Amino acid sequence: MTNSNLRTENHFDYVKISIASPQRIMDWGQRTLPNGQVVGEVTKPETINYRTLKPEMDGLFCEKIFGPSKDWECHCGKYKRVRHRGIVCERCGVEVTESRVRRHRMGYIKLAAPVSHVWYLKGIPSYVAILLDIPLRDVEQIVYFNCYVVLDVGDHKDLKYKQLLTEDEWLEIEDEVYAEDSTIENEPVVGIGAEALKQLLEDLDLNQIAEELREEITNSKGQKRAKLIKRIRVIDNFLATNAKPEWMVLDAIPVIPPDLRPMVQLDGGRFATSDLNDLYRRVINRNNRLARLQEILAPEIIVRNEKRMLQEAVDALIDNGRRGRTVVGANNRALKSLSDIIEGKQGRFRQNLLGKRVDYSGRSVIVVGPKLKMHQCGLPKEMAIELFQPFVIHRLIRQNIVNNIKAAKKLIQKGDDEVMQVLQEVIEGHPILLNRAPTLHRLGIQAFEPKLVGGRAIQLHPLVCPAFNADFDGDQMAVHVPLALEAQTEARMLMLASNNILSPATGEPIVTPSQDMVLGSYYLTALQPNFKKPNFGDNQKTYASLEDVIFAFEDKRVGLHEWVWVRFNGEVDDDEEANKPKESKELEDGSRLETWNFRRDRFDSQNNLISRFILTTVGRVVMNHTIIDSVSKT
């Protein structure tokens, strides 16, 4: 096996994001081809040739820079097939390799003039303004060519370092400096634009400033102290990461791989392209125009205007709309910049990296499952057969029901009874994980034992709803299948719903009846004033046991809120114990009968309870019988 076929694994502890130096930006995009040629700089705004539909050389889709657009084929077609792997075509300079390299190979644009990075300039807080200790408004005046800034006062007495000067003020000073009778030997130096900003940042001695600020903090109070702390925090971060402040001003900008900003041909022959290509094209056009103006020694005012336009083009590329007018495309729609692609719910991180679709997972609406135990959930058969398909196929082959995977899949598609039987065996004891977004605490994802149910909705026990913050008004939940034995064990031991009774935040019970359960319990035990209380001994309203009442209710001989007399020898919790009975009489056999508002008790001559009938509703009988039954089973 050759080394080229070996996949190397790089293990790392963390990922760190920091400011890239101009050299690193160029290193990202610069490559030396096997023939020694250095490529990487994008110099032309063209994308593809509309006649040949091939990428233009040195353009935004250049095959020499980013790699071939077709596997193992150079631009001119001289080399085709995998046998020419690694060869660089002498005619077109394209390396013969896989086209997927166009997903990770970068380029760069060498800028004719430095530009400020809009994140550090216009972010909140503005790190450039904090480091230089200049108000943000003044920094913007410098960057966007509205004001000059003093870089060196020279021998001029009235000027201060970092002082802002308007065009007229600087002209007056120039006249004074260059006058015949001038005594100024060392001329003051002023700058404008991102070049001046870069010079100011280069002049900063961070270690010395940090020492001075620490001394100043000890004697400061209130708002001034807070401002100093903010500044020293930024300086310490620069020192800790070995980053230089002048890196916040860009000399080169990276061009992301072409397959991440594609251009596709539509049916009518037209092309649809990523907004980034338009933004990059604006930058390249303005950069090339500025380079040409500098080359022909154009007037300073024209060059300065072009530099400002280049700054605005780079701002729009990095974060469109952060400053100035938003760049719009067709239909007056704002173009999506690099920041728009990264940030927000639909951005690269939340949508594509954190919100990835994973195998062995499903999603469906949840409905209440009143007959489930707390550690169980109802899993639709249609979903279960899809999630557990590899396990089912393995068992079908092992039990000699089918001979191969293809036959097993056909049997599964038919929905054969044997398949359902095998599925039942597979899910027995195999926990699944249910997750409801947003997962704000650890109980947002819990393990359950699946029970096969009909329909297409996941059934959930109502008691676990508070932990998930779920209700049954259309909420959806995701299902995940733990595959490894360790994962299954962990799910069963730690994540099973019946093991998560208490809230990890407060220590109080989180498994509490809510919504449907509270309403159902109230409805079941509610007293209806319009139902007449029966007399004791009424054959249709007197029952020998709780079970008899439930049978009569299920047989529809009695309603849920009707009053009934029922024999019950257990304890009754009511307020009548402290009062005297309404009636008490001795019977011929020596026993005693006591009548209360809601019960009739019969005692023998030794005052032992012989029988007790209570007056209650059918709903309360159902509730009590269910609770007694549950408690006796545990």
Curated annotation (Swiss-Prot):
It catalyses: RNA(n) + a ribonucleoside 5'-triphosphate = RNA(n+1) + diphosphate. Keywords: DNA-directed RNA polymerase, Magnesium, Metal-binding, Nucleotidyltransferase, Transcription, Transferase, Zinc. SMART domains: RPOLA_N. Zn(2+) binds at C74, C76, C89, C92. Mg(2+) binds at D471, D473, D475. GO terms for biological process: DNA-templated transcription. DNA-dependent RNA polymerase catalyzes the transcription of DNA into RNA using the four ribonucleoside triphosphates as substrates. This is DNA-directed RNA polymerase subunit gamma. The gene is rpoC1.
